Amino acid sequence: MSFQKTILRKTWWGLEAKSYTEIAQELPSQDESLRKWIAIYAVYHLNFENRHPGESYYKFLENAKNSKYVIIEFTLPIHFLETRDSIGANDTTITKCKTMETEEEINSFLYENNINPELFTPPWTCEYPLD
């Protein structure tokens, strides 16, 4: 009998409790000039209605605002990380972007895409480049 792996409870509860807006992990890249990440955003924590003046969200978050979660997978040239003070979503190449409503949907997506859910962490522990 085999059990499907899930996101570690400590990490998931941190996302649900608003300790962080996203959890992420770095993935292996087939291209040595690129780094690759996957992140799960708790979109329902974001305030799309009453923002501070000038505050904006990444386009993938704006597009997902009617969903509870969004998963984004993207690559980023290593050269950008080495030469720029900040990184934006326009610097990335999005390879997957999918909205979801439940933890079960997320776990199924991760399983189908051979992504180990136990490796998700808060963004600062995996050098996640998007703020």
Model-found features: residue ranges?
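Mixed-charge, Lys/Arg-enriched low-complexity segments
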Residues: 77-131
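Compositionally biased, low-structure terminal segments
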Residues: 4, 21, 59-61, 70, ...
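Intrinsically disordered, low-complexity segments enriched in small/polar residues
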Residues: 18, 39-42, 55-56, 67, ...
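Alpha-helical structural elements
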Residues: 7-8, 15, 32, 36, ...
